[in-house]
């Protein structure tokens, strides 16, 4: 009887050991502001330049959707949630792009094209956000989230500028 109990216990531990990695993989954290397709694109992009540009594309998309929602004449009961959700998604994309810059710097990857793209597009994002802060419709609904988005964009621009200054110059190729 005792040996049967021991065998049963070992069998259950074996099954639990096989199932545990699958359960952990199923609970892998996903960024709730990225769709499955977008998350796959980020995962598939191996180059930090590509990943940063993808995050900037997704941020631009969220900002465009936010502007579209603002322009819509709608009396939705959850309008505030939609607007704040889009701004939070924008901020998450910009923050992730800034995080990718930091990671690429640590790995000493050449991300100059992505940094220049971040500076150019980030300034445009910031101008749009500042314009909304001055005279955006229904500002009281999303004021705090808008302030966070502007702060995140400014921080990302500072990170990009700092990274561009700290990055070693590209190697000079000499003619043979």
Model-derived regions, located:
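Bacterial N-terminal signal peptides that target proteins for export
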Residues: 1-12, 16-20
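Long, charged/polar, soluble alpha-helical segments
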Residues: 25-176
């Amino acid at each position: 009887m005792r040996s049967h109990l021991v065998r049963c216990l070992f069998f259950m531990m074996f099954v639990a050991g096989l199932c545990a990695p699958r359960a952990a993989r199923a609970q892998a954290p996903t960024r709730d502001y990225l769709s499955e397709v977008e998350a796959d694109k980020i995962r598939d992009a191996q180059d930090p330049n590509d990943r940063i540009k993808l995050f900037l594309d997704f941020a631009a998309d969220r900002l465009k959707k936010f502007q579209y929602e603002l322009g819509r004449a709608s009396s939705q009961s959850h309008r505030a949630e939609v607007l704040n959700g889009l701004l939070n998604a924008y901020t998450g994309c910009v923050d992730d792009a800034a995080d990718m810059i930091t990671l690429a710097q640590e790995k000493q990857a050449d991300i100059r094209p992505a940094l220049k793209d971040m500076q150019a597009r980030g300034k445009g994002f910031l101008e749009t956000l500042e314009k909304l802060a001055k005279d955006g419709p229904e500002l009281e609904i999303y004021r705090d989230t808008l302030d966070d988005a502007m702060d995140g964009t400014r921080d990302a621009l500072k990170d990009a500028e700092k990274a561009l200054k700290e990055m070693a110059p590209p190697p000079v190729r000499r003619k043979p």
